[in-house]
């Protein structure tokens, strides 16, 4: 099953997450199919904290990909900020 979830990057004590479409059996930071966006939890000031390619997200959901609970929350947050 394809899932859309966060893959951690960044440095120690400076987390940065890529929002990726991947097979559910792969490791958290392992191989992925496509990078859909990013989430920067330590963004400050004018820095962008969340970016999601809505067209690719809609495509993956259309073919049956499931969102992780955290990604679902970030999608709702990004939608609210865009409106």
From Swiss-Prot:
Gene3D superfamilies, alphabetized: 3.30.1320.10
Xref: PROSITE patterns: RIBOSOMAL_S16 (PS00732)
GO molecular function, one term: structural constituent of ribosome
A GO BP entry: translation
Top-level taxon in the UniProt lineage: Bacteria
Organism (species): Herminiimonas arsenicoxydans
A Pfam family per the record: Ribosomal_S16
Keyword set, alphabetical order: Ribonucleoprotein, Ribosomal protein
Ribonucleoprotein recorded as keyword: yes
GO terms under cellular component: cytoplasm; small ribosomal subunit
Protein name as it appears in the record: Small ribosomal subunit protein bS16
UniProt record similarity statement: Belongs to the bacterial ribosomal protein bS16 family.
Keyword field contains Flavoprotein: no
InterPro entries registered for this protein in UniProt: Ribosomal_bS16, Ribosomal_bS16_CS, Ribosomal_bS16_dom_sf
